Amino acid sequence: MTLLASISTIGNVKSISKSNNFSSLSNSSLQSSNSIQCGGCGGGNSLIGTVGGLVGGVLVGTGIIVGTVIGTVNGVVGGLLSGPSCGCH
């Protein structure tokens, strides 16, 4: 019975671990799309915001919050370079 209980416990730990990974991926996607919304409005500047958003999403997925700041700053810079009507929305 003890061996069976141990195997059951190991199975539960794996299940929890998979749930946490899925959770991280979901947060990564959400952070990515939020950062992309901060991109510039036209020209090459929108690419700056998009790249910043993707980098931000990947870093948040690994547990580093700084990635979101990088994506947001790139989006704001792209918005400022494009004109006053652009920026984070």
From Swiss-Prot:
It comes from the Eukaryota. GO terms for biological process: sorocarp development. InterPro entries: HssA/B-related (IPR008455). PANTHER family: HSSA/B-LIKE PROTEIN 17-RELATED, HSSA_B-LIKE PROTEIN 17-RELATED. Belongs to the hssA/B family. This is HssA/B-like protein 14.
